[in-house]
UniProtKB/Swiss-Prot annotation:
Function (record text): Participates actively in the response to hyperosmotic and heat shock by preventing the aggregation of stress-denatured proteins, in association with DnaK and GrpE. It is the nucleotide exchange factor for DnaK and may function as a thermosensor. Unfolded proteins bind initially to DnaJ; upon interaction with the DnaJ-bound protein, DnaK hydrolyzes its bound ATP, resulting in the formation of a stable complex. GrpE releases ADP from DnaK; ATP binding to DnaK triggers the release of the substrate protein, thus completing the reaction cycle.
PROSITE patterns per record: GRPE
Organism of provenance: Sorangium cellulosum (strain So ce56) (Polyangium cellulosum (strain So ce56))
UniProt-recorded name of the protein: Protein GrpE
Stretches with biased composition (Polar residues): 1-14
Cytoplasm in keyword set: yes
Pfam families (UniProt xref): GrpE
Family to which the UniProt record says this protein belongs: Belongs to the GrpE family.
Main location: cytoplasm
Compartmental location: Cytoplasm
A GO BP entry: protein folding
Molecular functions per Gene Ontology: adenyl-nucleotide exchange factor activity; protein homodimerization activity; protein-folding chaperone binding; unfolded protein binding
Compositionally skewed regions (Basic and acidic residues) per UniProt: 17-26
Length: 194
């Protein structure tokens, strides 16, 4: 064998020995690591459990905070509405008090009209609108028919009277209008043939 072949063989043997040593070391690590791996897995499980508990606590706190914020917003909304309505109520009380001592009903009626206008203006500022009913086609999404009557003046399906007004808050129905709807002209029976 030549020197160069022997060198090549030694190099291969050296590389093989290194690779063999690395494999042996890796095998030794694998052989001794089940306990280590178990410890690492337990530590990782403990970290994950702790993270889960923190996340659950954060979510619970978020839910409680959100509930408090919603309740507070509702309270502020009711408070704002009451602040707008209390002056109307005050004027109603004044009108009732004045009605007891008023010599004529005309002044009481005028006071009630003024308070009614104030109330309608307050509702308007809040975005609450009265639903148009009389003379309009019956709309089941905003009208509640409580009666149908024959009418020669109105075609079938038209609202002819409002029993109770309905109201909308923007696009949201607060209360449907209770209405009487026309059935159209009454159909007269055909004369009997003799």
């Amino acid at each position: 064998m030549s020197d160069s072949e022997q060198n090549g063989s030694n190099q291969n043997t050296g590389e093989t020995a290194e690779a063999h040593a690395e494999r042996a070391e890796a095998a030794e690590q694998q052989a001794s690591t089940p306990e280590d791996k178990l410890g690492e897995a337990q530590a990782e499980a403990a970290r994950m459990r702790e993270q889960l508990l923190r996340t659950a606590a954060d979510f619970d706190n978020f839910r409680k905070r959100s509930r408090r914020e919603v309740e507070e917003a509702q309270r502020r909304g009711r408070e704002a509405i009451l602040k707008d309505l209390l002056p109307v109520f005050d004027n109603l009380e004044r009108a009732a008090s004045h009605a007891e001592s008023a010599p004529d009903a005309k002044s009481v009626a005028e006071g009630v009209r003024i308070v009614t206008k104030q109330f309608v203006d307050t509702l308007d500022r809040m975005g609450i609108k009265r639903i148009a009913a009389v003379g309009k086609p019956f709309d089941p999404s905003v009208h509640e028919a409580i009666q149908q009557l024959d009418s020669t003046e109105h075609p079938a399906g038209v609202v002819i009277a409002e029993v109770q007004p309905g109201y909308m808050l923007g696009d949201y129905l607060i209360r449907a209008a209770m209405v009487v709807v026309s059935k159209g002209s009454p159909v007269e029976p055909a004369p009997a043939a003799n």
